[in-house]
């Protein structure tokens, strides 16, 4: 298996998209509520501390958001990620007591929304805290709950707005450092210039290039690059949600590869199953380069900017030189 996790419960995972994650048991939820309440009480003083106090405790539900928190907050923030292991399937992540404690202690939380990290809502609602600010990226972008693709960080327009929102939230918690946070957010946004240039260069050279995917992990990025994703959306969504795709869609996907209708196959490097492995093998047999893309930021050695730049670089290498890159 190329992915470090495997999705083999195709039929049983059909409800995962709606629920966001596996349901938390009543007992665990009760314990979480107690843990969060204790943590919230312990940290309430810190959350309302005088400007210029100790480090702000912040949590990103996904490592990419935690990384941006750290870049914007700098020396005044202690940022951590709930989902930071690229060997974990984000779609089957289950919150633990330790996670509940971590979220309960946070003064700032950044989460994705659209059901991708619904366990965060469960934890936060178990014990609300007036000292906790939550940035829900879905709400920030004014996206509906019916938005089909939750991988918002792959849209180049997402993180600049997230960085600015983080700076604003941190400035409320520690107003004396507002200029520092705003300068860091501006520096982060400026640093995305290399990614913007790489996207523009790819689009100028390869706009309309046909590609296939197993899941919609990088679909927002593919759109910005001008690539033409020929894989049926319903196929991508079924694989993402752990549902068996229709025989018709499977046949379409096979034809894209066996008939050389696409220049590259992108797959979710973190999660594969027997079906997706068969498509990877078919692509390789037909000398179509395969590129692995990630749902959570690879660590160590990457920040959000260099991660996205690497994804664009690898896709360009596949299209231009038929170079496969399955691991960053």
Predicted regions and their residues:
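Extracytoplasmic metal-acquisition and chelation regions
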Residues: 2-3, 7-28, 38-328
């Amino acid at each position: 298996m190329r992915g470090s996790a495997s999705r083999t419960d195709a039929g049983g995972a059909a409800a995962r998209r709606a629920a966001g994650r596996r349901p938390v048991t009543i007992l665990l939820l009760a314990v979480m509520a107690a843990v969060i309440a204790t943590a919230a009480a312990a940290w309430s003083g810190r959350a309302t501390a005088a400007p210029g106090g100790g480090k702000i405790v912040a949590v990103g539900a996904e490592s990419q958001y935690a990384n941006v928190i750290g870049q914007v907050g700098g020396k005044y923030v202690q940022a951590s990620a709930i989902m930071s292991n690229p060997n974990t399937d984000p779609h089957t992540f289950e919150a633990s007591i330790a996670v509940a404690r971590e979220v309960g202690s946070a003064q700032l939380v950044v989460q994705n929304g659209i059901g991708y990290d619904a366990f965060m809502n469960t934890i936060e609602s178990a014990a609300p805290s007036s000292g906790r600010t939550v940035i829900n990226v879905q709400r920030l972008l004014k996206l509906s709950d019916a938005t089909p693709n939750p991988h918002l960080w792959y849209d180049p327009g997402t993180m600049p707005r997230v960085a600015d929102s983080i700076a604003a939230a941190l400035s409320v918690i520690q107003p004396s450092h507002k200029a520092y946070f705003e300068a860091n957010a501006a520096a982060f946004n400026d640093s995305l210039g290399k990614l913007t240039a790489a996207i523009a260069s790819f689009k100028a050279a390869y706009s309309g290039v046909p590609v296939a995917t197993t899941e919609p992990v990088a679909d927002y990025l593919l759109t910005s690059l001008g690539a033409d994703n020929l894989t049926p959306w319903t196929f991508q969504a079924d694989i993402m949600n752990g549902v068996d795709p229709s025989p018709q869609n499977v046949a379409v996907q096979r034809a894209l590869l066996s008939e050389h209708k696409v220049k590259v196959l992108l797959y979710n490097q973190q999660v594969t199953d027997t079906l997706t492995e068969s498509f990877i093998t078919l692509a390789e047999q037909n000398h179509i380069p395969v590129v692995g893309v990630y749902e959570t930021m690879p660590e160590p050695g990457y920040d959000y900017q260099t991660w996205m730049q690497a994804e664009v670089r690898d896709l360009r290498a596949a299209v231009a030189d038929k170079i496969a890159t399955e691991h960053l």
